[in-house]
Amino acid sequence: MGDSQYSFSLTTFSPSGKLVQIEHALTAVGSGQTSLGIKAANGVVIATEKKLPSILVDETSVQKIQSLTPNIGVVYSGMGPDFRVLVRKSRKQAQQYYRLYKETIPVTQLVRETAAVMQEFTQSGGVRPFGVSLLIAGYDDNGPQLYQVDPSGSYFSWKASAMGKNVSNAKTFLEKRYTEDMELDDAIHTAILTLKEGYEGQISANNIEIGIIRSDREFKVLSPAEIKDFLEEVE
């Protein structure tokens, strides 16, 4: 008996021990645009492709990298609307923490809270899993941190990771290039080169997005002009 008859039931395990709706959510992530993150010695970079459905779309209106708090940013692969819901929930969680303790939420705790929301949507009736994986980058008292959260609600800390449709090539490239003592500028160059590896067409400052956080603990999304400078450095 195959898994297909279980594919519409979120809360029923198939005979092979899978929740098939989560498998489908991971397929949505795997068909999304490539995103990646690299933890450097003095910061973290997250980057993603920004392919638009039409040349008529105003590219400035599309933002795939968002800040959750002043010192934490996030990027996704998968379904954009699902990402926006999670961003809103994570920001609310961070605000509640700040209101209660009068300090910014630790990166690990915000990751844990976000993962708990995603996990809840894998065992409730009448809902479906989120069709996104997240890379969350932050800098707090524990230094630079990078986490990946998947639709199942599982999360891990990474030195460098990638997700989306070009994930295997991107991870292979990152494994070759990554070093423990990598500085942030070198990590930005590596991120651009990794995106270039599987990009169909010409990469430019307008079709990729890059977010960085340094030891000043201020998450920043780079402007097209800043991305252009880094692109010129790697060419």
From Swiss-Prot:
Keywords for this protein: Cytoplasm, Nucleus, Proteasome
Primary localization: cytoplasm
Superkingdom as given in the UniProt entry: Eukaryota
Any one of the GO CC terms: nucleus
PROSITE patterns named in the record: PROTEASOME_ALPHA_1, PROTEASOME_ALPHA_2
InterPro entries per the UniProt record, alphabetical: Ntn_hydrolases_N (IPR029055), Proteasome_alpha (IPR050115), Proteasome_alpha-type (IPR023332), Proteasome_asu_N (IPR000426), Proteasome_sua/b (IPR001353)
Matching Pfam families: Proteasome (PF00227), Proteasome_A_N (PF10584)
Localization (cell): Cytoplasm; Nucleus
GO biological process: ubiquitin-dependent protein catabolic process
Coiled-coil positions: none
Keyword Endoplasmic reticulum annotated: no
Family of this protein: Belongs to the peptidase T1A family.
Free-text function comment from the UniProt entry: The proteasome is a multicatalytic proteinase complex which is characterized by its ability to cleave peptides with Arg, Phe, Tyr, Leu, and Glu adjacent to the leaving group at neutral or slightly basic pH. The proteasome has an ATP-dependent proteolytic activity.
Self-association state and partner proteins as the record states: The 26S proteasome consists of a 20S proteasome core and two 19S regulatory subunits. The 20S proteasome core is composed of 28 subunits that are arranged in four stacked rings, resulting in a barrel-shaped structure. The two end rings are each formed by seven alpha subunits, and the two central rings are each formed by seven beta subunits. The catalytic chamber with the active sites is on the inside of the barrel.
Protein known as: Proteasome subunit alpha type-2
Organism: Oryza sativa subsp. indica (Rice)
Organismal lineage: Eukaryota, Viridiplantae, Streptophyta, Embryophyta, Tracheophyta
Gene it is expressed from: PAB1
